[in-house]
C-alpha cells in the first residue's frame, strides 16, 4: 500500500474502439502502460492505471447492424473480449477498466459539457462537410481520390449538413502556449513537447462535438 502522502501518478492507454477484435498493437500499448504503472508503484507512487473501451461512433453502430445485434449487446460482447485480452496478457489486476457507456462516464461527460457551456466554450452552428466513416474524420476535396478516401476506397463518403454543437478550441491557443512556456517539463520527451507546441502555434480550430444522426 502506498503511503498517504505519496505522490500520485496517472497513466492511461487510449480506449480502443470495439468495432473489431483486439490486435497486436493493442497488446503492445497495454503492456507498455502496465510496465510503467508497475515501475511507478515500485518507486512508491500511488498509481491510477486506466484503460477501457470506446463504445460510441458510427462505425460501431454499423458493425452491430452487420452482425444483426443491438448496439448495446454488441459492445457488451466486445468489451468482455477486451477484458479477456487484458487477463491473458497478465495486465495488472487493479487496472481501471472504463467503458464510455458506463453510467459514471456518461455522468462525468455531462458535467464536463455543462461546465464548458457555462464558461462560453460551446456554441451552435451549421455543419456541412464530407465525412469518412472509416477514418471518422472530415475530408477536404484535396484528400479524396475519385470522390473516395484513399484509405477506405470501399466506403462511401457521407455528406453531412446539420446544425451541430461546437467546442471553442481556438479560445485556448494563447493560454496553452503561455502554460507551455511556464512549464517546460510538462511533456517528456522534449521532441514530443515540441510537436505539441508546433501544432498549437499553427492555430487551433473549433470542432464539432455532436451529431444529429
Predicted feature locations:
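A glycine-rich helix N-cap at a beta->alpha junction
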Residues: 75-94
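Structured secondary-structure scaffolds
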Residues: 2-51, 99, 104-108, 158-213
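Feature captures the FAD/FMN-dependent oxidoreductase FAD-binding
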Residues: 101-121, 131
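A charged helix-plus-loop insertion that forms the helical arch/lid used to bind
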Residues: 63-76
Amino acid at each position: 500500500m502506498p503511503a498517504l502522502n505519496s505522490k500520485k501518478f496517472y497513466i492511461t492507454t487510449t480506449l480502443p474502439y470495439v468495432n473489431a477484435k483486439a490486435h497486436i498493437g493493442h497488446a503492445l500499448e497495454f503492456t507498455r502502460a502496465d510496465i510503467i504503472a508497475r515501475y511507478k508503484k515500485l518507486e512508491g507512487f500511488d498509481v491510477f492505471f486506466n484503460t477501457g473501451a470506446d463504445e460510441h461512433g458510427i462505425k460501431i453502430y454499423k458493425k452491430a447492424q452487420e452482425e444483426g445485434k443491438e448496439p448495446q449487446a454488441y459492445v457488451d460482447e466486445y468489451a468482455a473480449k477486451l477484458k479477456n485480452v487484458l487477463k491473458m496478457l497478465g495486465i495488472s489486476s487493479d487496472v481501471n477498466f472504463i467503458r464510455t457507456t458506463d453510467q459514471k462516464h456518461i455522468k462525468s461527460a455531462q458535467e464536463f459539457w455543462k461546465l464548458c457551456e457555462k464558461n462560453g466554450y460551446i456554441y451552435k452552428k451549421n455543419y456541412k462537410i464530407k465525412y469518412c466513416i472509416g477514418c471518422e474524420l472530415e475530408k477536404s476535396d484535396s484528400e479524396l481520390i475519385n470522390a473516395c478516401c484513399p484509405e477506405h476506397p470501399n466506403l462511401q463518403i457521407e455528406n453531412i449538413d446539420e446544425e451541430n454543437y461546437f467546442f471553442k478550441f481556438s479560445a485556448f491557443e494563447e493560454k496553452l502556449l503561455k502554460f507551455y512556456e511556464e512549464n517546460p517539463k510538462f511533456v517528456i520527451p522534449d521532441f514530443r513537447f515540441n510537436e505539441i507546441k508546433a501544432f498549437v502555434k499553427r492555430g487551433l480550430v473549433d470542432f464539432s462535438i455532436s451529431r444529429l444522426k
